[in-house]
């Protein structure tokens, strides 16, 4: 029997399709007991659920969100529960209540705790970590770890991060680590960046802007009596730099569309952290001094570099020295 060219083409196409389909089935069968991963699909930065997705019956989660978004209403200078913080809200440092990529989000909190804290040298629970923020970033006092408010904050963090695998930080978690400069970050240059970019919201003296009913800050104070203290994570300029690069100005920047350069971010971070703020007793922090972050501004250190260089850089020589010490 003589086949037409068209018939031959159709027949070959059918055979090819069957073979391809069989290979796909075989591939799935071989991986039936494993998670099928397509390496050609790039990882997408983590975004958290927004408050409108909280179910009506999840009242504890809703309270947790409100405590993070409006902390000062409950615990600030005129707090309805207690007057134990500086008037800032958790949301002032954790963008949109901790749901934005590289916005100091809460994606990795649940999967990270309990864990050994380098800062305290002890195992730390989520509640203890939260209270650390109350004492340092909010320059206040710890709340009862068994209180409804603490349980609500933890419930919200579980709601945000329960889908994150244990010990696997998602892309976009926390704060982006910017490349080190080849020089020290410069507060004088940073002041110019602050005046051009930050001052319109945070005020010329970094005092911030209170909300309409003065129950908290719409734009938080960056230094001074009502800002974070010297024990806070933001008293390390790498954290401030990574945060402002991807999130500031608040109404303009995103990680996809930053408004300032890496260099400007480092310099404005140096300017902000060169300003006066409440002091925190850090003498018991990092009992193992080899665990101190490179930009922790308080000695002693395992290396010979000064507190000034540990605060502002340049950090590359410190990084190289630490690597050599660890090899020995």
Where are these regions (language model features)?
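C-terminal capping alpha-helices of c-type cytochrome domains
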Residues: 63, 129, 133-169, 256-287, ...
């Amino acid at each position: 029997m003589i086949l037409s060219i068209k018939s031959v083409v159709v027949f070959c196409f059918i055979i090819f399709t069957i073979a391809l389909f069989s290979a796909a089935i075989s591939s799935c069968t071989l991986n039936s007991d494993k998670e099928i991963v397509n390496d050609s699909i790039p990882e997408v930065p983590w975004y958290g659920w927004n408050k409108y997705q909280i179910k009506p019956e999840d009242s504890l989660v809703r309270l947790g969100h409100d405590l993070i978004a409006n902390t000062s209403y409950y615990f600030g200078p005129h707090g309805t529960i207690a007057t134990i913080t500086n008037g800032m809200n958790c949301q002032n440092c954790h963008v949109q209540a901790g749901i934005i990529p590289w916005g100091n989000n809460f994606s990795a909190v649940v999967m990270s705790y309990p864990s050994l804290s380098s800062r305290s040298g002890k195992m730390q629970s989520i509640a203890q970590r939260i209270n650390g923020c109350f004492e340092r970033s909010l320059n206040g006092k710890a709340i009862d770890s068994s209180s409804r408010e603490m349980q609500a904050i933890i419930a919200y963090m579980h709601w945000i991060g329960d889908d994150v695998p244990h010990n696997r930080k998602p892309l976009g978690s926390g704060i982006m680590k910017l490349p080190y400069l080849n020089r020290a970050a410069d507060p004088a240059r940073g002041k110019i960046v602050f005046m051009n970019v930050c001052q319109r919201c945070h005020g010329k003296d970094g005092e911030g802007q209170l909300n309409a009913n003065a129950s908290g800050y719409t734009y938080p104070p960056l230094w001074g009596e009502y800002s974070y203290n010297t024990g806070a994570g933001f008293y390390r300029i790498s954290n401030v730099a990574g945060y402002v690069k991807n999130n500031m100005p608040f109404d303009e920047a995103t990680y996809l569309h930053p408004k300032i350069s890496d260099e400007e971010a480092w310099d404005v971070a140096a300017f902000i952290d060169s300003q006066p703020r409440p002091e925190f007793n850090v003498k018991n922090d990092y009992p193992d001094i080899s665990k101190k972050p490179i930009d922790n501004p308080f000695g002693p250190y395992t290396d010979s570099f000064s507190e000034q260089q540990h605060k502002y850089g340049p950090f590359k020589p410190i990084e190289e020295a630490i690597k050599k010490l660890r090899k020995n």
